[in-house]
C-alpha cells in the first residue's frame, strides 16, 4: 500500500533541520529548503536549484508541496475581490480582498465548511470537510497580497480570520500560518494588524492568552442573552455567556488587549431594549469596542436587517458608557463576498 506523503510545508524550520540530521545530512539544508518553500514560493523540489539533486530526490520520496489555485476571481462594484480557491484535493474555499481608502484587508478561511451552526451564516450550511493546512491559509494571504499590489499599488495591510470556518477549531494550523505571515520569510507583518474572529470557545480563548499571542481578538457575539444567542448560534448552548465572560476577563488580564465584539442587529430577534441593556452590561466586563455589522441576506429571508432606529439605540446606549462603536457597512454583497455570505458557490462548477 502506498503511504500518503506529508505536505512538507506543515513542518517548522526546526522540524526540517531535524529531518536532514536524521537522514545524515547537514542541518542547514533545512534552512535552505525552508527559504525555498516560503520566501521563494517553490512549487516543486526541482525549483530548488541550490539544493543537491540527491537531496531533492530524497525530498520527493518523502514529501509533497501542496499549493492552492485561484479558480475564479470576482470583482465587486466597490472594488472588493472574492477568490474561489481550489485546494490540492479538489475542495474549494473562499477568501476576500477588502479595500478602503487607507488600507487593504484579507479575509481568509481556516476550514473547508465550518464546524459550527450559526443560523445566519451561509458557510454553516456546509458541513466541515476538513481543516486547512498552514500552507493553504498562508497561500490565500499571499494571493490576496498580490491582488492588493496589482489593483491598489501597495502590499496587504491587514488580515482578518473571518472567512469560512471557526479558526479556534483549527488552532495549531492557524497559529503556524500567522507565524509565517509575521516572519521575515513571509510578509513581515505586525501581529497587531491581524485579527482572529471566533464564535467564542472559552477554553481556546484562555489557551490563546496562555500562549501569549500578539494578534487581536474579535468575538462574534450577536446577543448577550443566552437564550437569544442560542437561537442565533445553536452551538452556544454548550458555551454559556458566563463562561465566555470568564474567558475574556482572563484574556484581558493576561494580554491587556481589548476585545472587539462583532454584532448584527436583526429585526424581531435582538432589536429590543432588553438586548441593548444586556450588551451594555456585557461590555462593562472587559475593555472593548463594538462593531455593529450590516446584515447580508443568504437567500431565505429568515433573518432580516433591523431598522436604523434600532441600530441607533445600540449606538447611543454604548456610547453613553464610553464604548467605541463602529457601524460596518458590508462590502462585496453583489458577489456574495460580504460577512456571512461565503458558501462555496464555485465548488460545484
Curated annotation (Swiss-Prot):
Keywords: 4Fe-4S, Cytoplasm, Disulfide bond, Iron, Iron-sulfur, Metal-binding, Methyltransferase, rRNA processing, S-adenosyl-L-methionine, Transferase, tRNA processing. It is found in: Cytoplasm. Its EC number is 2.1.1.192. One of its GO terms (cellular component) is cytoplasm. InterPro entries: Aldolase_TIM (IPR013785), Methyltransferase_A (IPR040072), RlmN_N (IPR048641), RNA_MTrfase_RlmN (IPR027492), rRNA_lsu_MTrfase_RlmN/Cfr (IPR004383), rSAM (IPR007197). Gene3D superfamilies: 1.10.150.530, Aldolase class I. Residues 100-334 form the Radical SAM core domain. S-adenosyl-L-methionine binds at residues 165-166, 197, 220-222, 296. Disulfide bonds join 107-339. This is Probable dual-specificity RNA methyltransferase RlmN.
